Structures are given as C-alpha cells and as structure tokens.
C-alpha cells in the first residue's frame, strides 16, 4: 500500500489516497499498525482521502488516530491532506473542499516554498452548547466557560468548545511539569462528562494577540501541535475576553494564526511533505 507522509508543525500524518490503492476496509486496524512508531512507519494519525470532483476541488476526508479510533476532524490533518492534493495536482485551482464527519471544510492554497505549503482552513463556527460538544454533567448549558472540573480532588476551571471535535481548555499562569500535565491531560480526556472523550489544551496567555499551548490529543496523547486544538484554544481565549479575535498560537514547533470573524473561524499554517513509501499489508 502506497502512502505519503506529511507533518504540520510536528503533528505528523500518513496520507492514503483511495484513488491509488485498493481500499482495505479495516482502517482502524491499519492505523494502529502503520502509526506505531517502533514496529510501523510512525505517525499521529492516518488520513484516508479520495477526490470526487477535481474540477470543483471536492474530496472526502477521514482521520484515524494512532490508537485506531476515528476522529471527526483535524485541523493539521486537513491541512496535510490539502497539501498532498496540491502537491500531486489532484485538484484544479487553489481551493479544495473536504467532506468530513463534521461537515464541509474549505482549504485555500496560499504559497509553497520547496516542500512546505501554507494553507488557510475555514473551520466554520465553533459549537459552544453542551449538547453540541458534547459535554454531559446532567445539565444543558449554552456555553461552558470556567466550569469547575474536578480531577483527582483538584478543581480546574475549564472552558469547553467544539471545532467539530471536543476540546477542553485549561488556562495556566505557567505550565506544570511535563509529568503532571500529561497525567492531567489523560484524566481529562476520559472524564465521564465527555461521552466521546476530549482533546485537552493547556494555555498560557502572553498578551491580547498571542497565546502558547501544550496539546493532549484524544486517542494519541501528547502532540507537538494541533490545528483544531490551536483553534479551540484561541476560541476559548476570546470567549473569556483574554485576547482579541485574531490570535497567534505558539506551539512547540512554530506558530499558527487563528482569526474569528462573525460565524467563521479560519486558521492559517504550514504543512510539509516528508516522504513517500509503501507498507506491506498483513
């Protein structure tokens, strides 16, 4: 099976184009096998895409985490999938529209420098109600801002949003040590109030235009960056009145730009080609 590897700020993915390989059917098992970093190729996730209309730039997108679970959406994953299609000239024009489990997402090609593509994604409107996220503490809530979530007898004021997938934002004055925040991220991910589990972001606000984020990704664990996580962190910062509506998000591998205008949140960032390869299916 042929694949291409891309990454966006260290968040790495293996792209499988269904128009070039025979569909395996068991993508969950394949993701677990191929994403394993010691016995497989190694990646945070597997992207399965197919072009439906090259002239209109229409394609389908599915993402499977390294643990085999299927996610609704991934900002960095969408960007990597778009970079693949642009690099292979699989679509005409400078825009690709992906049909995802969370609805249509539009990606615009901005520029290319060698193997690095800059792409802007329209992620639509954030979902803020407890039913839409989903978040279930037994009450219906229009917004979840500074909710007192108890983890191991410690209360964390969290802000919860969905960018097509659930995110729990934890604001800190300084980042906890790595062992502590990884343990907390794992506990929050599987908290019973999140019926579909959740992604977790630990956020430091530098000023009204910049935040810094650490990421715990559902089904993966620690990641160097996260597109939807960066967007959710920016949205949470805006909801709390801590930043303006145009936010630079610092990750451990570089920045992403998030802009919230009206009902639309857009994110601009890089996606970089790494290599192509083939994987022997068992």
In which residue ranges do the predicted regions lie?
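N-terminal, positively charged, Ser/Thr/Ala/Gly-biased leader segments
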Residues: 1-22, 121, 138-161
